[in-house]
């Protein structure tokens, strides 16, 4: 036979292990520095990752993950505990605790909240009304959709995402929305108040995010939206294997 024997798996040398450790320490220091800078300089998301008001944006690392699923609306959402989220890049590890998020609604609500928050210093409260949110999402203006919007905001807030990658290092327990509450509920002055997690903003830093035209994006079906997330987050996308795409959608259909 022409095939050579399989090489023995390489053990990491002491030097390589030390190099890994140094790299980890550097990553942690850089992350700490970025977060301290955000605080000290009162930076906004827009300072780190600008996008136009007719656009919305998303960190590439989340665009390529199965964080927002495309499962059937009739299928009840799963409650997930330290659930490993599929990611296109093997280098990225994401675990998720919370109620399953869907591309159909949660993804859009989150992107719109980032839009509202983008010009405020990270970590300061941002207010908007359910009327504004539903209008910007292209949703009907009625109580049912206000309730739907509130459910999405609550789900997004009740999340714990652990993230690690070679580029960023480790993020411990990031929430997609750091704080959410409804002020003056039931009154004419009622509004939502949210804060964005500074750890979340780190995912955007260094130009690692994608921008897209909102009017077109929000009209896409959930599956088309996830396909778009993949392609928009790669400058030169690899052809996408169907199985990889299925996993990226968090789909549980066998086909």
Predicted regions and their residues:
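Charged, alpha-helix-forming regions
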Residues: 1-255
């Amino acid at each position: 036979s022409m095939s050579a024997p399989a090489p023995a798996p390489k053990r990491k040398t002491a030097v390589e292990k030390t190099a890994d450790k140094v790299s980890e320490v550097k990553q942690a220091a850089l992350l700490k520095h970025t977060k301290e800078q955000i605080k000290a300089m009162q930076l906004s998301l827009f300072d780190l990752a600008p996008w136009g008001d007719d656009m919305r944006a998303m960190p590439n690392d989340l665009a390529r993950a199965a964080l927002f699923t495309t499962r059937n609306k009739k299928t009840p959402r799963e409650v997930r505990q330290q659930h490993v989220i599929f990611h296109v890049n093997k280098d990225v590890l994401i675990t998720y605790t919370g109620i399953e998020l869907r591309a159909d609604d949660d993804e859009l609500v989150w992107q719109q909240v980032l839009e509202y928050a983008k010009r405020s210093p990270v970590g300061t409260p941002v207010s908007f009304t359910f009327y504004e949110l539903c209008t910007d999402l292209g949703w009907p203006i009625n109580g049912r959709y206000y309730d739907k919007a509130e459910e999405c905001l609550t789900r997004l807030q009740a999340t714990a995402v652990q993230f690690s990658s070679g580029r960023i290092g480790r993020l411990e327990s990031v929430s997609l929305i750091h704080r959410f509450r409804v002020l003056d509920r039931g009154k004419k002055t009622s509004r939502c108040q949210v804060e964005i997690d500074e750890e979340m903003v780190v995912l955007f830093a260094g130009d690692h995010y994608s921008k897209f035209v909102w009017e077109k994006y929000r009209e896409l079906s959930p599956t088309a939206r996830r396909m778009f997330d993949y392609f928009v987050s790669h400058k030169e996308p690899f052809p996408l294997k169907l199985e990889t795409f299925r996993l990226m959608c968090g789909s549980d259909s066998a086909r």
